[in-house]
Amino acid sequence: MAAARATTPADGEEPAPEAEALAAARERSSRFLSGLELVKQGAEARVFRGRFQGRAAVIKHRFPKGYRHPALEARLGRRRTVQEARALLRCRRAGISAPVVFFVDYASNCLYMEEIEGSVTVRDYIQSTMETEKTPQGLSNLAKTIGQVLARMHDEDLIHGDLTTSNMLLKPPLEQLNIVLIDFGLSFISALPEDKGVDLYVLEKAFLSTHPNTETVFEAFLKSYSTSSKKARPVLKKLDEVRLRGRKRSMVG
């Protein structure tokens, strides 16, 4: 009589008890999120606003995509959620303002964070200033502050991955220019000047396309970054190289 073969879960699948517990946890998370205010729907995540344990919170949920294998989806979502939580913690340890992480729900790939109440995006602040003052001169102090913050971030070898003025907040009182960095979903750790240069190039492209006629503001930012970072020289050299590659691609089409 042949011995019975032990059955094992298919690659990437959870054993039955674990799968049931995971499904139950996801269901609880789904019920909780359904009672919150949806404030943003992106390609990779939904952002909700609500209360978590009595505190104003923002919840970022990386939802599954139907076109990916479930096991790959679970690994990718978990990895990006962990990366973002670690980046926020790394910022705060370095003295860079970022939301407090309240809780990480690995079952549903949800990140529960502090809501920066009363804040405005740097994008909205710049647009408002340009509308009222009709000149970028009033933004020089803001540019200097952004340069200092991003220099410190890069000196910690943290690459944001999606630097835009929408991913920077100003918390009240606005005139104090207290910048809070958010949305580290594409962040990673790297000491390479190339990666930091690309990070700055992404910001430059987003900045100048979103805020026309602010070239002098971005120049002030780079000057501040240069004087604030201990590693600025090779990074800015790489930024120039990345710009050149970008121009060549534009000419080729």
From Swiss-Prot:
Keyword Cytoplasm: yes
BP term (GO), one: tRNA threonylcarbamoyladenosine metabolic process
PROSITE patterns: PROTEIN_KINASE_DOM, PROTEIN_KINASE_TYR
Subcellular location: Cytoplasm; Nucleus
Segments of this protein annotated with the region Disordered: 1-21
UniProt keyword list: ATP-binding, Cytoplasm, Disease variant, Epilepsy, Hydrolase, Intellectual disability, Kinase, Nucleotide-binding, Nucleus, Phosphoprotein, Serine/threonine-protein kinase, Transferase, tRNA processing
Catalytic activity, EC: 3.6.-.-, 2.7.11.1
Location of the motif Nuclear localization signal: 78-95
InterPro entries: Bud32 (IPR022495), Kinase-like_dom_sf (IPR011009), Prot_kinase_dom (IPR000719), Tyr_kinase_AS (IPR008266)
Binding site for ATP: 39-47, 60
Major location category of this protein: cytoplasm
Molecular function in Gene Ontology: ATP binding; hydrolase activity; p53 binding; protein serine kinase activity; protein serine/threonine kinase activity
Entry annotation: catalytic residues: 162
Catalytic activity: L-seryl-[protein] + ATP = O-phospho-L-seryl-[protein] + ADP + H(+); L-threonyl-[protein] + ATP = O-phospho-L-threonyl-[protein] + ADP + H(+)
GO cellular component: cytoplasm; cytosol; EKC/KEOPS complex; nucleoplasm; nucleus
Annotated function: Component of the EKC/KEOPS complex that is required for the formation of a threonylcarbamoyl group on adenosine at position 37 (t(6)A37) in tRNAs that read codons beginning with adenine. The complex is probably involved in the transfer of the threonylcarbamoyl moiety of threonylcarbamoyl-AMP (TC-AMP) to the N6 group of A37. TP53RK has ATPase activity in the context of the EKC/KEOPS complex and likely plays a supporting role to the catalytic subunit OSGEP. Atypical protein kinase that phosphorylates 'Ser-15' of p53/TP53 protein and may therefore participate in its activation.
Disease affiliated with this protein: Galloway-Mowat syndrome 4: A form of Galloway-Mowat syndrome, a severe renal-neurological disease characterized by early-onset nephrotic syndrome associated with microcephaly, central nervous system abnormalities, developmental delays, and a propensity for seizures. Brain anomalies include gyration defects ranging from lissencephaly to pachygyria and polymicrogyria, and cerebellar hypoplasia. Most patients show facial dysmorphism characterized by a small, narrow forehead, large/floppy ears, deep-set eyes, hypertelorism and micrognathia.
Name of this protein: EKC/KEOPS complex subunit TP53RK
Naturally occurring in which organism (per UniProt): Homo sapiens (Human)
Gene name linked to the record: TP53RK
